[in-house]
Amino acid sequence: MSQRLPSLLLTFVCAAGAQPTFYLPEHLRGGEFAAQHPSLVPPPHLAGPKPSFIDVPVDHFNGGTATWKLKYWTTTSAEWSAAKPGPIFIEMPGEGAAGGPPSVRKGSLIDHFNGVGVGLEHRFFGTSIPLNSSTTKALDAYLSVQQNLADIVFLLAHIKDAMKLPANHPVVSLGGSYSGASAAWIRMLYPSQITAAIALSPPIRATLDFRAYDESNAAALASPAPSCRDQTVATMRALDAAIAADEIKTMALFNASHLHATPMGLTDFLYGIADAAASPVQYGQKAVLCSALAAALPAHPTQDEYVEFYANWTLKQYGGAYFHGCFYNSDCMRDAEHAYPAESARSWYHFKCSELGYLQTATPTPSSPERDGVNPSVRPSSLTVATLIAQCNYIFKRETHGVNATQLLGAAIDKFNHKFGGADSSAGLFATASKIGFFDYSDDPWRTASVLKTTRASLPVHLAVCDGCGHCGSGATPSIAKEVAQIQVQLLTAWLKTT
């Protein structure tokens, strides 16, 4: 372990393994990829504590009396007592259905600090739909990062009151990915209510053109040897050519013929193709793609051989219904205003299309391909800001009336980053923030939207470096997972002492 000042970047090195702290989204669980990596899939649902509900304002900021029932769970560690209560640990809600109370297993932070765990379901995800409406009008009015954070502060006040805890009782926010960014944002926005935060793989910087996601995937696939990246690039260029020559035939190879007849079907198809290659990298299992490329392709593949290989591999890894869910179907999301569970996909796209961006575009071919630092794209080349903005407008039935939709989203993203600071610890609310631990992993393509360095000891940035260290620790060995946990304990021990 080495500490590099002034960036306060702690780096630990390990070999790749499989100790994830993050589960695959539902649309990636239909094939061999999930079956062969069971630790990436949540365990079967077991009967557990029933959730509680609290009436929460639909709109925390613009008045009105409307409320909705927020679903939440609480659980206490074995050693917790009213005489000596440990801190509250709030597990920030993510962009999907909540599964139940936080874990208090031995070794967890809640267990270590004899704390209370609180979990909840994010508004407009799962079955938590305020006003029972996911229309564009409802989402525009009531789905935002700040409405979610206000829900949590409201809930925490209720829990403290119910447990007879003082208003200043310490609270730690925890999360990974979007919920990791939320853990940091809530500490910034409500420092008097949130004592400290632990944020894993947090895309804290909203961004319009997130081509860095593509560049990071290409870099990860080039290690330990460039052959995997080069073959993936060749596969994507073969797919570009095949789609241009015969879109219907190419879609049929992926069991996606139904998308051809829809207005956004090609964009949906391209995004699914891109995700199929990106997901093994993101979840710490890039060898699944690299080994298949090495084993299945001849020495000098033709365009048809690349395309046929990738179609067969995609359906094998993610199942024959990969393109038949809502996540890669803009028509499904467009019509999902009253249709659980498709509403969750619609809600996440609304976040992307209205406030956070994260539009995962293909890296344009540089004018000088040999230029240092440029990785060729491992996504279909037609995934551009323009095509993804058009998809946003279609899903949410937005008429631009001559207004530049790209500029509108860019302005919303700039406003968001101006408030919270993006990844710049000297800007916005970030400038006065403290007691936030940022944890990232070297192969995670979301890392470029996280905090790469800070100049304050109260905002430590930790990077786990290994060939295969993916999102939220997926692909990291038990030893590196243990080391990360130890650092978190050290940080919280120090920070909670000062409250």
Predicted regions and their residues:
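Alpha/beta-hydrolase active-site loop
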Residues: D140-A162
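Alpha/beta-hydrolase fold nucleophile elbow
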Residues: L165-G176
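Alpha/beta-hydrolase
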Residues: W185-S354, Y358
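Glycine-rich "HGGG/HGxG" loop immediately N-terminal to the catalytic nucleophile
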Residues: F124-L139, C472-G475
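Catalytic-loop region of hydrolases
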Residues: F12, G17-G119, T135, Q490-T499
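Short beta-strand/loop motif that positions the catalytic acidic residue
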Residues: F438-D440
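Small-residue-rich helix-loop
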Residues: E337, P341-D414
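Glycine-rich nucleophile elbow surrounding the catalytic serine of serine-hydrolase chemistry
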Residues: G175-W185
